[in-house]
Amino acid sequence: MHKKLYISDVTLRDGMHAIRHQYSIQNVQDIARALDEAKVDSIEVAHGDGLQGSSFNYGFGAHSDLEWIEAVAEVVKHAQIATLLLPGIGTIHDLKAAYDAGARVVRVATHCTEADISKQHIEYARSLGMDTVGFLMMSHMTTPDHLAIEAKKMESYGATCVYVVDSGGAMNMHDIRARFRALKAALRPETQTGMHAHHNLSLGVANSIAAVEEGCDRIDASLAGMGAGAGNAPLEVFIAAAERLGWHHGTDLYRLLDAADDIVRPLQDRPVRVDRETLALGYAGVYSSFLRHAEIAAKKYGLKAVDILVELGKRRMVGGQEDMIVDVALDLKRREARA
């Protein structure tokens, strides 16, 4: 394969979920510096739930998005700074502030059937001259053909790249291939595609490889898999696999290995791995960032987190419905009392 893959690191955004959005300024600078020296193309920086995600519903961050972005801007020389915006949480005013702080790439994220709410934000990002990406979350919850229709909407608003986002880590390689084939058939040849995997079924790297084989241009990954649930595709593992396949990625594998083990892994207060709870996310198709919230609810109400997660999957809950986790826990508690 001759084209260079665009390597998009998400350790400082999706990785926020793994430590409940508590990175210090020193942490983000250490991680960003290591990623920059390893020559990744972009480094995404924000609260785990995007600009202005810091809240009662999602959890308060140790710092503001702008403090984190400005801190990263001080140390990077090669990589572009990316950020995430969920319409309804972040606004175009927040996007402008992020741009002023140093962000040059924005991923505008919606549920996979709600691309129409991204129009204002994508158009505004393009007017700022940002690298503007559409991000279709929970892509397993709709058909490949419908996902392509939603991707086409984002393209029409001005997105120059659209992502298949496996937020629940619920898809396999066949699911990924079907979605990329549908997107490639619907989108203009010049519109790029990207893959954002989660590792809940241990398929994060395999799914990313399948995506590239179907023509995907950009791959999201994180150091040591640092991310929601069982984490994202581990960056150093994907790069090692890409190297074995002879793919052009432009990054320094050994620097990534050192950063993953020496800087990122020691920060994990809960191991980022496939275990009973994170496997339940992938099996039940649940939004990966529900994990820590469900574990807190389970402890509070004397339940098993896995039972809460499976019930959330049955109810087809999506990102943004974190408040329903307590509702589900109370329902399960009532059921238990009646039994």
Swiss-Prot record:
Reactions catalysed according to its record: (S)-4-hydroxy-2-oxopentanoate = acetaldehyde + pyruvate
Chain ranges of the Pyruvate carboxyltransferase domain: 5-257
Alphabetic keyword roster: Aromatic hydrocarbons catabolism, Lyase, Manganese, Metal-binding
Entry annotation: catalytic residues: 17 (proton acceptor)
Binding site for Mn(2+): 14, 196, 198
PANTHER family listed in its UniProt record: 2-ISOPROPYLMALATE SYNTHASE 1, CHLOROPLASTIC-RELATED, HOMOCITRATE SYNTHASE-RELATED
Family, similarity comment: Belongs to the 4-hydroxy-2-oxovalerate aldolase family.
Protein name, entry field: 4-hydroxy-2-oxovalerate aldolase 1
Organism, as annotated: Burkholderia vietnamiensis (strain G4 / LMG 22486) (Burkholderia cepacia (strain R1808))
